[in-house]
């Protein structure tokens, strides 16, 4: 649109940050007349939406800010949003005085307000956005990310999220259903539900609302006629009761892909982390899940070298990896975060030992993945296509979250096709359309 102001936004971290960025784009477009651009040097407003789960993204923030400040055009504003904004607040402006405003992860709806204030810092983690009606914007016309809760009530000793996103509040069911219906009317055939602990949905609402469990929410969403697929992240192993597993397994619209954040295979370490479950509970849930849904793919998160992790504890983690054979593993060395309980733990694992353990774990993960990928060769999967690259390969995901590409055109985008796997790679499978 002629004369519209330009917005450049970079998003770091999780899917919830991606959805927050979509919310900010919608607000700035509707209320302030901005349109997005991929050209930083032409932008009138530059936003970096940050992550603070580990130390590395925080360090990256100030590196990126320096680059942005050098490349921005005269008069352009720079804003810092998200979890690091919530955590560091005014310190960001002290360290980078060219930053125009700082907006916390719990205050996304105030983006237009802070934009017009000089060096504004808005980081109230108790601010309630659970009933705020955001204007609609989606980066993909084929899939809709939908928040079902904000914040987190867990007290994991390593995690800073409760300090940056506040207490957990469920978004009213009627708002979620309305957003899903609107997305489907707009052409989306898949919705992706977001929350820190999605299967704890319904525990607390900010107002008087019908108490609906996560399993019941899934049932209601699946009644939307043109909606074909439902995904979600992340469920907490502690809340994986039988009702949830049964609904997941029996509901044909729910994709058979589950992210189960293990964090450690040692019950002792899990207790130190205050995860709320044991190794035995986790394995029991996996066994129940696979008994009811044999083709389910299971991904996980693992932290190595948590304070006090012994060689025996680490071996227990490797053992559970061999037993479960996760389809994907996101693994990290423990990174102490400020204002967390574990920051004060003194039994720190030696850095060389930590690095060695991470390498060992990742090598095992690759071996497991390579073996599992071989089993896909020759099989047929129903793929929902969402992307087309410049070489005219269309890619999408199967029900169990395999990333699959075929030679094709934009006519495949937003469509389902049966694909026979003809070649396997570590991160993407290749195939040909059949039928």
Swiss-Prot record:
Q: Which residues form the TRAM domain?
A: 374-435
Q: Which InterPro entries match?
A: Elp3/MiaA/NifB-like_rSAM, Methylthiotransferase, Methylthiotransferase_CS, Methylthiotransferase_N, Methylthiotransferase_N_sf, MiaB_methiolase, rSAM, rSAM_horseshoe
List the subcellular locations.
Cytoplasm
The entry marks the following residues as binding [4Fe-4S] cluster 2, namely 152, 156, 159
Q: Does the keyword ATP-binding apply?
A: no
Q: Which UniProt keywords apply?
A: 4Fe-4S, Cytoplasm, Iron, Iron-sulfur, Metal-binding, S-adenosyl-L-methionine, Transferase, tRNA processing
Task: Name the GO cellular-component terms.
Answer: cytosol
> Where in the numbering of this chain does the Radical SAM core domain appear?
138-372
Q: What is its EC number?
A: 2.8.4.3
Per UniProt, [4Fe-4S] cluster 1 binds at 14, 51, 83
Paste the cofactor note: Binds 2 [4Fe-4S] clusters. One cluster is coordinated with 3 cysteines and an exchangeable S-adenosyl-L-methionine.
Q: Which reaction does it catalyse?
A: N(6)-dimethylallyladenosine(37) in tRNA + (sulfur carrier)-SH + AH2 + 2 S-adenosyl-L-methionine = 2-methylsulfanyl-N(6)-dimethylallyladenosine(37) in tRNA + (sulfur carrier)-H + 5'-deoxyadenosine + L-methionine + A + S-adenosyl-L-homocysteine + 2 H(+)
List the Pfam families hit by this protein, alphabetically.
Answer: Radical_SAM, TRAM, UPF0004
- Every MTTase N-terminal domain range: 5-120
The protein's required cofactor(s) are namely: [4Fe-4S] cluster
Is the keyword S-adenosyl-L-methionine assigned to this protein?
yes
Show the GO MF annotations: 4 iron, 4 sulfur cluster binding; metal ion binding; N6-isopentenyladenosine methylthiotransferase activity
- Indicate the enzyme's highest-level EC class: transferase
Free-text function comment from the UniProt entry: Catalyzes the methylthiolation of N6-(dimethylallyl)adenosine (i(6)A), leading to the formation of 2-methylthio-N6-(dimethylallyl)adenosine (ms(2)i(6)A) at position 37 in tRNAs that read codons beginning with uridine.
Q: Which PANTHER family match?
A: CDK5 REGULATORY SUBUNIT-ASSOCIATED PROTEIN 1 (PTHR43020), MITOCHONDRIAL TRNA METHYLTHIOTRANSFERASE CDK5RAP1 (PTHR43020:SF2)
The annotated subunit structure for this chain is: Monomer.
Spell out the protein name for this chain. tRNA-2-methylthio-N(6)-dimethylallyladenosine synthase
What is the scientific name of the source organism?
Sulfurimonas denitrificans (strain ATCC 33889 / DSM 1251)
């Amino acid at each position: 649109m002629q004369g519209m102001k330009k917005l450049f936004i970079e998003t770091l971290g999780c899917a919830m940050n991606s959805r927050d960025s979509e919310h900010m784009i919608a607000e700035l477009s509707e209320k302030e007349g901005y349109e997005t651009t991929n050209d930083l040097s032409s932008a009138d407003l530059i936003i970096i939406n940050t992550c603070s789960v580990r130390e590395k993204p925080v360090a990256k923030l100030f590196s990126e800010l320096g680059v942005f400040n050098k490349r921005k055009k005269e008069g352009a504003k720079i804003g810092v949003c998200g979890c690091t904004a919530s955590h560091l607040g005014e310190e960001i402006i002290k360290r980078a005085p060219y930053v125009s405003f700082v907006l916390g992860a719990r205050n996304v709806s105030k983006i237009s307000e802070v934009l017009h204030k000089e060096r504004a810092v808005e980081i109230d983690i108790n601010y309630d956005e659970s009933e705020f009606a955001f204007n609609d914007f989606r980066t993909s016309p084929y899939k809709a990310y939908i928040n079902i809760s904000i914040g987190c009530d867990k007290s994991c000793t390593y995690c800073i999220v409760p300090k940056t996103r506040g207490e957990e509040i469920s978004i009213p069911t009627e708002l979620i259903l309305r957003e899903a219906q609107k997305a489907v009317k707009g052409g989306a055939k898949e919705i992706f539900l977001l929350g820190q602990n999605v299967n704890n949905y319904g525990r607390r609402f900010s107002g008087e609302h019908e108490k609906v469990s996560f399993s019941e929410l899934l049932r209601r969403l699946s009644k939307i006629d043109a909606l074909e697929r439902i995904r979600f992240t992340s469920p907490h192993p502690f809340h994986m009761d039988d009702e949830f597993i049964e609904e997941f397994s029996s509901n044909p619209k729910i994709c058979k892909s589950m992210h189960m954040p293990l964090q450690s295979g040692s019950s002792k370490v899990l207790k130190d982390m205050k995860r709320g479950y044991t190794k035995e509970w986790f394995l029991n849930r996996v066994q129940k899940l696979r008994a009811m849904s044999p083709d389910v793919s299971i991904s996980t998160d693992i932290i190595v070298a948590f304070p006090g992790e012994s060689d025996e504890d680490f071996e227990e983690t490797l053992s559970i990896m061999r037993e479960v054979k996760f389809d994907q593993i996101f693994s990290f060395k423990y990174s102490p975060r400020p204002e967390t309980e574990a920051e004060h733990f003194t039994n720190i694992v030696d850095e060389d030992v930590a690095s060695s353990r991470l390498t060992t774990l990742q090598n095992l993960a690759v071996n497991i993945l390579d073996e599992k990928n071989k089993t896909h060769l020759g099989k047929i999967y129903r793929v929902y296509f969402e992307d087309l690259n410049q070489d005219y390969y269309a890619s999408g995901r199967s029900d169990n979250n395999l990333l699959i590409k075929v030679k094709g055109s934009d006519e495949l985008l937003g469509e389902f096709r049966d694909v026979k796997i003809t070649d396997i790679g570590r991160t993407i499978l290749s195939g040909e359309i059949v039928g």
